């Protein structure tokens, strides 16, 4: 039992040190923040495209209804 304690303690110590280094690197990466990744750009552009399509469809529908009203003289 005693012979296993030292190697396990040593491995635990090395694991905690490497984990702390990973957290520091992750924190440094998150501090940049000014850069947008390609996925974020794609997501923003897709959202803008969908909004523009929705607005265009709404405007087109309104224009068509107005023209139909003018042609039928029903308004």
Curated annotation (Swiss-Prot):
Q: Does Ligase show up as a keyword for this record?
A: no
Q: Which UniProt keywords apply?
A: Amphibian defense peptide, Antibiotic, Antimicrobial, Cleavage on pair of basic residues, Cytolysis, Disulfide bond, Fungicide, Hemolysis, Secreted, Signal
List S-S links within the chain. 69-75
Signal peptide boundaries: 1-22
| Function field | Antimicrobial peptide. Active against some Gram-negative and a variety of Gram-positive bacterial strains. Active against fungus C.glabrata 090902 but not against C.albicans ATCC 10231. Shows hemolytic activity against human erythrocytes.
As recorded in UniProt, coiled-coil segments are none
What is a single Pfam family found in this protein's UniProt entry?
Antimicrobial_2
**One GO CC term of this entry?**
extracellular region
Protein's name according to its UniProt entry? Brevinin-2SN2
